[in-house]
Amino acid sequence: MTHQHLKEAVDSHFETIQSELEHLAAIPSVSAAGFDPESVRESAEYVANLLRKAGFPDVRILGPPGAHPAVYASYPAPEGAPTVLLYAHHDVQPAGEGWNSPPFEPIERNGRVYARGIADDKSGVLMHVGAMLAHGGTPPVGVKVIIEGEEEIGSLHLEDFL
């Protein structure tokens, strides 16, 4: 696939990727004491479904008791090709003060979309999904993805997931 073909493939999926990012950002997956951990589980389930739709044949939600769930996905390497590991996280910090709009209701202003967690790191999740879509669900390398739900509280169980 040439750079031009890859760019065209990314462009063809851009609206879908942006829409999915906005849906993911609307899930208040706050990873902090005093917040409902169910929203982090909901976020993990949404991420798992995104990865399945993108073409990953093996997608699992992982989590030891008491942990916020991580999502693992893999695509086998073609013969002789390397495997890459991609990382992102789907949890966010509490919104805090200073928002001009509800933090979990994505809004577009001046060509940019704003919502809690959209840059850190739900866009990273969609970047991985978009790369898989751009390759038509069949990348030229093996791909393993880990998307954790505890980065904002110190990645307490990341080693367990790996």
Predicted ranges, named:
Residues T2-I118, H135-V141, G149:
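Acidic/His- and Gly-rich active-site-bordering loop/insert found
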